[in-house]
Protein backbone atom coordinates (compact mmCIF):
# COMPACT_ATOMS: atom_id res chain seq x y z
CA UNK A 1 0.00 0.00 0.00
CA UNK A 2 0.98 3.65 -0.35
CA UNK A 3 1.38 3.93 3.44
CA UNK A 4 3.71 0.89 3.57
CA UNK A 5 5.84 2.28 0.72
CA UNK A 6 6.09 5.62 2.50
CA UNK A 7 7.08 3.90 5.76
CA UNK A 8 9.79 1.92 3.96
CA UNK A 9 11.12 5.07 2.31
CA UNK A 10 11.18 6.85 5.67
CA UNK A 11 13.00 3.90 7.27
CA UNK A 12 15.59 4.08 4.49
CA UNK A 13 16.09 7.81 5.06
CA UNK A 14 16.47 7.25 8.80
CA UNK A 15 19.11 4.56 8.20
CA UNK A 16 20.91 6.95 5.86
CA UNK A 17 20.77 9.69 8.50
CA UNK A 18 22.11 7.29 11.14
CA UNK A 19 25.07 6.45 8.90
CA UNK A 20 25.65 10.14 8.20
CA UNK A 21 25.51 10.97 11.90
CA UNK A 22 28.15 8.36 12.71
CA UNK A 23 30.41 10.03 10.14
CA UNK A 24 29.57 13.57 11.29
CA UNK A 25 30.66 15.16 14.50
CA UNK A 26 28.26 17.81 15.76
CA UNK A 27 30.23 20.73 17.19
CA UNK A 28 29.57 21.12 20.90
CA UNK A 29 27.70 24.11 22.32
CA UNK A 30 29.89 27.19 22.40
CA UNK A 31 28.74 30.00 24.70
CA UNK A 32 28.86 33.43 23.08
CA UNK A 33 28.99 32.21 19.49
CA UNK A 34 25.28 33.00 19.06
CA UNK A 35 22.99 35.44 20.88
CA UNK A 36 21.11 34.21 23.95
CA UNK A 37 17.62 33.09 22.98
CA UNK A 38 15.69 30.26 21.39
CA UNK A 39 15.16 29.08 17.84
CA UNK A 40 11.77 27.33 17.78
CA UNK A 41 11.77 24.76 14.97
CA UNK A 42 8.66 22.72 14.18
CA UNK A 43 5.47 22.26 12.20
CA UNK A 44 4.25 25.74 13.11
CA UNK A 45 1.46 25.77 10.52
CA UNK A 46 0.39 22.19 11.26
CA UNK A 47 -3.19 21.49 12.32
CA UNK A 48 -2.17 18.44 14.37
CA UNK A 49 -0.97 18.05 17.95
CA UNK A 50 2.68 18.58 17.02
CA UNK A 51 1.81 21.91 15.43
CA UNK A 52 -0.24 22.93 18.45
CA UNK A 53 2.63 21.93 20.74
CA UNK A 54 5.09 24.16 18.86
CA UNK A 55 2.68 27.11 18.88
CA UNK A 56 2.12 26.71 22.62
CA UNK A 57 5.88 27.05 23.11
CA UNK A 58 5.93 30.18 20.93
CA UNK A 59 3.12 31.73 22.94
CA UNK A 60 4.85 30.85 26.22
CA UNK A 61 8.06 32.56 25.12
CA UNK A 62 6.07 35.56 23.87
CA UNK A 63 4.32 35.97 27.20
CA UNK A 64 7.60 35.73 29.09
CA UNK A 65 9.25 38.15 26.64
CA UNK A 66 12.04 35.66 25.91
CA UNK A 67 13.94 36.41 22.68
CA UNK A 68 13.17 33.82 20.01
CA UNK A 69 12.56 33.19 16.33
CA UNK A 70 10.20 30.73 14.67
CA UNK A 71 11.16 28.41 11.82
CA UNK A 72 8.50 26.30 10.14
CA UNK A 73 9.68 22.76 9.43
CA UNK A 74 7.89 19.47 8.97
CA UNK A 75 8.63 15.96 7.77
CA UNK A 76 6.25 15.06 4.90
CA UNK A 77 3.44 14.24 4.57
CA UNK A 78 2.82 16.34 7.69
CA UNK A 79 -0.98 16.49 7.40
CA UNK A 80 -2.97 19.66 6.78
CA UNK A 81 -1.16 22.93 7.40
CA UNK A 82 -3.55 25.86 7.56
CA UNK A 83 -2.68 27.57 10.86
CA UNK A 84 -1.43 31.08 10.16
CA UNK A 85 -1.09 32.30 13.75
CA UNK A 86 2.64 32.95 13.30
CA UNK A 87 2.73 33.26 9.50
CA UNK A 88 4.11 36.81 9.57
CA UNK A 89 6.95 35.82 11.91
CA UNK A 90 8.35 32.76 10.16
CA UNK A 91 12.01 32.94 9.22
CA UNK A 92 14.86 30.78 7.95
CA UNK A 93 17.32 32.68 10.15
CA UNK A 94 18.46 31.01 13.39
CA UNK A 95 20.37 33.68 15.33
CA UNK A 96 20.11 32.20 18.83
CA UNK A 97 22.16 29.71 20.83
CA UNK A 98 19.39 27.26 21.82
CA UNK A 99 17.34 25.16 19.42
CA UNK A 100 13.98 23.84 20.69
CA UNK A 101 13.04 21.33 18.02
CA UNK A 102 9.42 20.13 17.99
CA UNK A 103 10.00 17.00 15.93
CA UNK A 104 9.36 13.62 17.53
CA UNK A 105 12.15 11.09 17.92
CA UNK A 106 10.64 8.98 15.14
CA UNK A 107 11.48 11.72 12.61
CA UNK A 108 14.37 13.47 14.31
CA UNK A 109 16.97 11.77 12.13
CA UNK A 110 15.08 12.91 9.03
CA UNK A 111 15.01 16.44 10.43
CA UNK A 112 18.78 16.34 10.94
CA UNK A 113 19.31 15.19 7.37
CA UNK A 114 16.90 17.80 5.98
CA UNK A 115 17.94 20.83 8.03
CA UNK A 116 21.66 20.14 7.93
CA UNK A 117 24.45 19.76 10.46
CA UNK A 118 25.05 23.52 10.60
CA UNK A 119 21.70 24.01 12.36
CA UNK A 120 22.99 21.83 15.21
CA UNK A 121 26.60 23.01 15.37
CA UNK A 122 27.68 25.10 18.39
CA UNK A 123 24.11 25.31 19.73
CA UNK A 124 22.42 23.70 22.72
CA UNK A 125 19.90 21.36 21.09
CA UNK A 126 16.65 20.43 22.85
CA UNK A 127 14.24 17.92 21.36
CA UNK A 128 10.61 18.32 22.44
CA UNK A 129 9.29 14.77 22.18
CA UNK A 130 6.04 13.02 22.92
CA UNK A 131 5.57 9.26 23.08
CA UNK A 132 2.71 7.07 24.24
CA UNK A 133 4.14 3.82 25.63
CA UNK A 134 6.36 2.85 28.57
CA UNK A 135 8.98 1.38 26.24
CA UNK A 136 10.81 3.26 23.49
CA UNK A 137 11.50 1.86 19.99
CA UNK A 138 15.09 0.71 19.60
CA UNK A 139 15.32 2.11 16.06
CA UNK A 140 14.78 5.63 17.41
CA UNK A 141 17.60 5.51 19.97
CA UNK A 142 20.12 7.20 17.61
CA UNK A 143 18.00 10.36 17.94
CA UNK A 144 19.43 10.81 21.45
CA UNK A 145 22.83 11.49 19.83
CA UNK A 146 21.35 14.60 18.25
CA UNK A 147 20.22 16.33 21.44
CA UNK A 148 21.82 17.80 24.53
CA UNK A 149 18.52 17.60 26.39
CA UNK A 150 14.96 16.36 25.88
CA UNK A 151 11.76 18.08 26.96
CA UNK A 152 8.46 16.23 27.18
CA UNK A 153 4.86 17.26 27.91
CA UNK A 154 4.37 14.84 30.84
CA UNK A 155 6.12 12.79 33.50
CA UNK A 156 4.63 9.75 31.77
CA UNK A 157 6.85 10.43 28.73
CA UNK A 158 9.79 11.62 30.83
CA UNK A 159 9.87 8.44 32.92
CA UNK A 160 9.95 6.32 29.76
CA UNK A 161 12.73 8.26 28.06
CA UNK A 162 14.91 8.35 31.18
CA UNK A 163 15.29 4.58 30.88
CA UNK A 164 17.22 5.07 27.63
CA UNK A 165 19.55 8.02 28.16
CA UNK A 166 21.76 9.73 30.73
CA UNK A 167 21.07 13.11 29.15
CA UNK A 168 18.64 15.46 30.92
CA UNK A 169 14.97 14.67 30.28
CA UNK A 170 12.69 17.36 31.67
CA UNK A 171 8.91 17.61 31.86
CA UNK A 172 7.68 20.89 30.37
CA UNK A 173 3.88 20.52 30.31
CA UNK A 174 1.80 22.25 27.68
CA UNK A 175 0.55 25.62 28.90
CA UNK A 176 -3.00 25.18 27.65
CA UNK A 177 -4.91 28.29 26.65
CA UNK A 178 -6.67 27.71 23.32
CA UNK A 179 -6.21 30.47 20.79
CA UNK A 180 -9.13 32.85 21.09
CA UNK A 181 -10.97 34.56 18.28
CA UNK A 182 -13.82 37.00 18.10
CA UNK A 183 -15.65 34.62 15.75
CA UNK A 184 -17.78 32.01 17.51
CA UNK A 185 -19.65 29.18 15.82
CA UNK A 186 -22.87 27.69 17.10
CA UNK A 187 -24.10 24.13 16.63
CA UNK A 188 -26.00 25.16 13.50
CA UNK A 189 -22.66 25.96 11.85
CA UNK A 190 -21.61 22.34 12.41
CA UNK A 191 -25.00 20.92 11.33
CA UNK A 192 -25.55 19.60 14.85
CA UNK A 193 -28.89 19.58 16.70
CA UNK A 194 -29.27 22.50 19.06
CA UNK A 195 -31.65 20.75 21.45
CA UNK A 196 -29.70 17.56 22.25
CA UNK A 197 -27.18 16.66 24.95
CA UNK A 198 -24.08 15.93 22.88
CA UNK A 199 -20.99 13.86 23.61
CA UNK A 200 -17.94 14.42 21.40
CA UNK A 201 -15.19 12.03 20.33
CA UNK A 202 -12.44 13.63 18.25
CA UNK A 203 -9.13 12.35 16.95
CA UNK A 204 -6.64 12.66 14.11
CA UNK A 205 -6.30 9.72 11.72
CA UNK A 206 -2.54 10.16 11.82
CA UNK A 207 -2.59 9.34 15.55
CA UNK A 208 -3.52 5.65 15.07
CA UNK A 209 -7.14 4.67 15.66
CA UNK A 210 -6.26 1.69 17.86
CA UNK A 211 -4.53 4.05 20.30
CA UNK A 212 -7.22 6.74 20.28
CA UNK A 213 -9.84 3.96 20.55
CA UNK A 214 -12.99 5.77 19.33
CA UNK A 215 -14.76 2.43 18.86
CA UNK A 216 -14.90 1.95 22.64
CA UNK A 217 -16.66 5.29 23.06
CA UNK A 218 -19.13 4.41 20.30
CA UNK A 219 -19.77 1.01 21.87
CA UNK A 220 -20.33 2.56 25.32
CA UNK A 221 -22.70 5.15 23.85
CA UNK A 222 -24.72 2.56 21.94
CA UNK A 223 -24.95 0.34 25.01
CA UNK A 224 -26.13 3.23 27.20
CA UNK A 225 -28.49 4.97 24.78
CA UNK A 226 -29.28 2.78 21.77
CA UNK A 227 -29.58 -0.72 23.20
CA UNK A 228 -33.20 -1.17 22.15
CA UNK A 229 -36.15 0.90 20.94
CA UNK A 230 -37.32 1.66 24.48
CA UNK A 231 -33.87 2.97 25.43
CA UNK A 232 -33.64 4.99 22.22
CA UNK A 233 -36.97 6.65 22.93
CA UNK A 234 -36.03 7.40 26.52
CA UNK A 235 -32.75 9.03 25.49
CA UNK A 236 -33.85 10.56 22.19
CA UNK A 237 -32.43 13.91 23.30
CA UNK A 238 -28.89 12.51 23.60
CA UNK A 239 -26.39 12.32 20.74
CA UNK A 240 -22.78 11.44 19.97
CA UNK A 241 -20.55 13.46 17.63
CA UNK A 242 -17.60 11.72 15.95
CA UNK A 243 -15.05 14.15 14.50
CA UNK A 244 -12.12 12.72 12.56
CA UNK A 245 -9.41 15.15 11.55
CA UNK A 246 -7.32 14.32 8.49
CA UNK A 247 -9.58 11.41 7.61
CA UNK A 248 -7.87 11.29 4.23
CA UNK A 249 -4.87 9.71 5.98
CA UNK A 250 -6.90 6.55 6.58
CA UNK A 251 -9.79 5.48 4.38
CA UNK A 252 -9.90 2.35 6.54
CA UNK A 253 -10.73 4.44 9.62
CA UNK A 254 -13.67 6.02 7.80
CA UNK A 255 -14.94 2.64 6.67
CA UNK A 256 -14.74 1.12 10.17
CA UNK A 257 -16.41 4.09 11.86
CA UNK A 258 -19.12 4.18 9.19
CA UNK A 259 -19.95 0.50 9.66
CA UNK A 260 -20.47 0.78 13.44
CA UNK A 261 -22.63 3.90 13.37
CA UNK A 262 -24.80 3.22 10.32
CA UNK A 263 -27.79 2.03 12.37
CA UNK A 264 -27.77 5.01 14.78
CA UNK A 265 -29.49 8.21 13.74
CA UNK A 266 -28.33 10.00 16.89
CA UNK A 267 -24.62 9.61 16.05
CA UNK A 268 -23.29 12.48 13.97
CA UNK A 269 -20.16 11.90 11.88
CA UNK A 270 -17.95 14.83 10.92
CA UNK A 271 -14.82 14.76 8.79
CA UNK A 272 -12.92 17.31 6.78
CA UNK A 273 -10.74 20.19 7.85
CA UNK A 274 -11.60 22.61 10.65
CA UNK A 275 -9.75 25.77 11.57
CA UNK A 276 -8.41 26.15 15.09
CA UNK A 277 -11.16 28.58 16.05
CA UNK A 278 -13.79 26.10 14.86
CA UNK A 279 -12.23 23.31 16.91
CA UNK A 280 -12.16 25.43 20.06
CA UNK A 281 -15.79 26.44 19.52
CA UNK A 282 -16.87 22.84 18.90
CA UNK A 283 -15.26 21.78 22.18
CA UNK A 284 -17.29 24.46 23.96
CA UNK A 285 -20.52 23.73 22.03
CA UNK A 286 -20.81 20.08 23.11
CA UNK A 287 -21.82 18.91 26.58
CA UNK A 288 -19.14 16.26 27.27
CA UNK A 289 -15.84 15.30 25.63
CA UNK A 290 -15.02 11.57 25.65
CA UNK A 291 -11.56 9.98 25.31
CA UNK A 292 -11.34 6.25 25.99
CA UNK A 293 -7.77 6.30 24.68
CA UNK A 294 -5.38 3.43 25.26
CA UNK A 295 -2.53 5.84 25.82
CA UNK A 296 -1.72 9.56 25.64
CA UNK A 297 1.61 11.34 25.89
CA UNK A 298 -0.31 14.36 27.20
CA UNK A 299 -3.87 14.65 25.88
CA UNK A 300 -4.17 18.18 24.51
CA UNK A 301 -7.81 17.99 23.43
CA UNK A 302 -8.85 16.81 26.89
CA UNK A 303 -6.99 19.71 28.49
CA UNK A 304 -8.47 22.18 26.01
CA UNK A 305 -11.97 20.84 26.67
CA UNK A 306 -11.50 21.36 30.40
CA UNK A 307 -10.14 24.85 29.75
CA UNK A 308 -13.35 25.89 27.95
CA UNK A 309 -15.47 24.31 30.71
CA UNK A 310 -16.60 21.12 28.99
CA UNK A 311 -16.70 18.02 31.25
CA UNK A 312 -14.44 15.14 30.21
CA UNK A 313 -14.80 11.35 30.42
CA UNK A 314 -11.36 9.75 30.04
CA UNK A 315 -9.30 6.62 30.57
CA UNK A 316 -7.49 6.85 33.91
CA UNK A 317 -4.02 6.09 32.50
CA UNK A 318 -1.03 7.82 30.91
CA UNK A 319 -0.25 11.50 30.39
CA UNK A 320 -3.75 12.89 30.94
CA UNK A 321 -3.80 11.75 34.59
CA UNK A 322 -1.29 14.50 35.38
CA UNK A 323 -3.85 17.26 34.82
CA UNK A 324 -7.11 15.48 35.69
CA UNK A 325 -8.40 13.21 38.43
CA UNK A 326 -11.74 11.96 39.74
CA UNK A 327 -12.41 15.39 41.29
CA UNK A 328 -12.18 17.19 37.94
CA UNK A 329 -13.25 14.57 35.38
CA UNK A 330 -15.04 11.26 35.02
CA UNK A 331 -12.13 8.81 35.10
CA UNK A 332 -12.69 5.39 33.55
CA UNK A 333 -11.12 2.18 34.86
CA UNK A 334 -9.05 -0.03 32.57
CA UNK A 335 -7.20 -3.30 32.08
CA UNK A 336 -3.64 -3.34 30.77
CA UNK A 337 -3.55 -5.36 27.55
CA UNK A 338 -0.80 -6.51 25.23
CA UNK A 339 -0.74 -5.32 21.63
CA UNK A 340 -1.73 -8.32 19.56
CA UNK A 341 0.07 -7.01 16.45
CA UNK A 342 1.96 -3.97 15.22
CA UNK A 343 -0.02 -0.75 14.99
CA UNK A 344 2.76 1.42 13.60
CA UNK A 345 4.66 2.84 15.32
CA UNK A 346 3.40 0.80 18.29
CA UNK A 347 4.87 -2.69 18.27
CA UNK A 348 3.35 -6.04 19.14
CA UNK A 349 4.14 -7.16 22.68
CA UNK A 350 3.97 -3.70 24.27
CA UNK A 351 1.12 -2.90 26.67
CA UNK A 352 -1.41 -0.12 26.96
CA UNK A 353 -4.72 0.51 28.73
CA UNK A 354 -8.07 -0.80 27.54
CA UNK A 355 -10.97 1.14 29.07
CA UNK A 356 -13.44 -1.12 30.86
CA UNK A 357 -16.84 -0.57 29.28
CA UNK A 358 -18.34 -2.10 32.42
CA UNK A 359 -17.28 1.10 34.15
CA UNK A 360 -18.00 3.35 31.20
CA UNK A 361 -21.60 2.47 30.43
CA UNK A 362 -23.22 4.25 33.37
CA UNK A 363 -20.97 7.29 32.99
CA UNK A 364 -22.63 8.91 29.97
CA UNK A 365 -26.01 8.67 31.71
CA UNK A 366 -24.51 10.13 34.87
CA UNK A 367 -23.17 12.99 32.76
CA UNK A 368 -26.54 13.77 31.22
CA UNK A 369 -28.21 13.90 34.61
CA UNK A 370 -25.55 16.02 36.30
CA UNK A 371 -24.84 18.58 33.58
Where are these regions (language model features)?
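Conserved small/polar residues in nucleotide/adenosyl-binding loops
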Residues: 2-8, 359-366
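Extended catalytic core of nucleotide-activated donor transferases of GT-like folds
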Residues: 22, 26-29, 39-41, 74-160, ...
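Conserved donor-binding/catalytic core segment of Leloir-type glycosyltransferases
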Residues: 39, 193-212, 218-222
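Nucleotide-activated donor-binding/catalytic signature segment of Leloir-type glycosyltransferases, i.e.
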Residues: 252-277
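Short hydrophobic beta-strand element within catalytic cores of glycosyltransferases
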Residues: 311-314, 324, 330-331
Amino acid sequence: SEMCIRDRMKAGIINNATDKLSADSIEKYEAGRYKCGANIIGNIKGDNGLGQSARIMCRLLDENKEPHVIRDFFVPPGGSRSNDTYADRLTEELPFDVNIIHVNASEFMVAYLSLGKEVWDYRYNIGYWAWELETFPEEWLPAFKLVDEVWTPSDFVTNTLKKYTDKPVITVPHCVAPETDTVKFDRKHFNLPEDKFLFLVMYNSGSVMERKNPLAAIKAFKEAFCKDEQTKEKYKDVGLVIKISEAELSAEDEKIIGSVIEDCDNIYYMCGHMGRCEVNTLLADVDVYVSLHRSEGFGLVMAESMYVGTPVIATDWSGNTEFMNSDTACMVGYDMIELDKDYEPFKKGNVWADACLLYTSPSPRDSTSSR
